[in-house]
Structure formats: structure tokens, C-alpha cells
Amino acid sequence: MKVFLGLLLGYSTILILTYQSPTTQHPPKEELEYWCTYAKTCDFCWDCQNDTCINKVINESISMNSIVNCRVTRDSQSQSCFYEISLKIPNYHSMECSYPRLYKHFMSMEKWRDENWPILIRHYCFYLVFSFAFAGCVAFAICKNLRLRTTMKLLMLLSILVLLSQPILNN
């Protein structure tokens, strides 16, 4: 019985190993185009020298600070491709190999890079001030025992001011 269980365990291990490629930080060169298309800032996609990195597939350049360590696995049994992305907090991205999709976290990192930080900070500061104004308006209405209709008018006026100020914030 023990021999039978040992053979069964050994056979299942061989089957698992044939269906799943090992996790690697260095995928084969012929697969680089595939892996680098859907998680663009993985370290194996870039050739870095002197704080400048050039993409091995599309000849694009990027700052060395944007590069993250990645490991990839392809499971041929379930037809899934898996990225393990090591930022400060590990992230994972799984997709069907035949229907790949972009890793959204990288896209948002690219949008917020460099020139967009001042706009982002302005927006957050504005919304913080707006939140205090909104809370102050509600507190004022409660303290003065204003009727609901008057309170709603004050809140609508505050909301209109927020909407009108949006184009100014985006400049």
C-alpha cells in the first residue's frame, strides 16, 4: 500500500511539473514581448545603465525608479499566466494566456508620474477644504436650527462652487 501511494504521489508530482512552468525572473527571450506587453515595468523587460532604462522590446526609455521586480509563471493546464510583482507590498496579476489584459496598477503608476503630482496634490487639498466646508455647513445648520430647505440650499450652493472650480484646478 505504501509503495502504491508513493508511486501515485511521484506520478502526480511529475504531472504537475509538466503542466506548470517554473516561476522565473528571467523568461526566455522569445517570450519577452508577451510578458513585457502586459506588465510594462517588470525588471526583466528593461536594460538599465546610468539611471536610464531602455525597453528590450519596444525601445522606450524610462527612469530606473519605476522598475519593479517581477516573477512570471505560465500554467498550461489552466491556461493562465501569473505575474508576482514585488513592490513594497507584493501584488499579483493573473490572466488567461490567450486573453491577456494589462496590469492596472502599472497604468495608474504611469499616469501619476512626475508632471501630474502638483495637480493631484491641488485636488486633494481642495477636496480636504471642501470636506471641512461641508461639515461646517451642516454644523452651522444644526446650531442655528435652520430648516431643512435652507440647509439644502446652502449645500447646493457649495456643490455648485465645487463644480465651477474644477476647470481652475486642472490648469
UniProtKB/Swiss-Prot annotation:
Principal place of residence: host cell
Membrane topology: Multi-pass membrane protein
Transmembrane segments: 2-20, 123-143, 150-170
Disulfide links within the chain: none
Compartmental location: Host membrane
Gene Ontology CC, one term: membrane
Origin superkingdom: Viruses
Keywords on record: Host membrane, Membrane, Transmembrane, Transmembrane helix
Its biological purpose: Plays a role in virus cell tropism, and may be required for efficient virus replication in macrophages.
Family as reported in the entry's similarity comment: Belongs to the asfivirus MGF 110 family.
UniProt-recorded name of the protein: Protein MGF 110-12L
Originating species: African swine fever virus (isolate Tick/Malawi/Lil 20-1/1983) (ASFV)
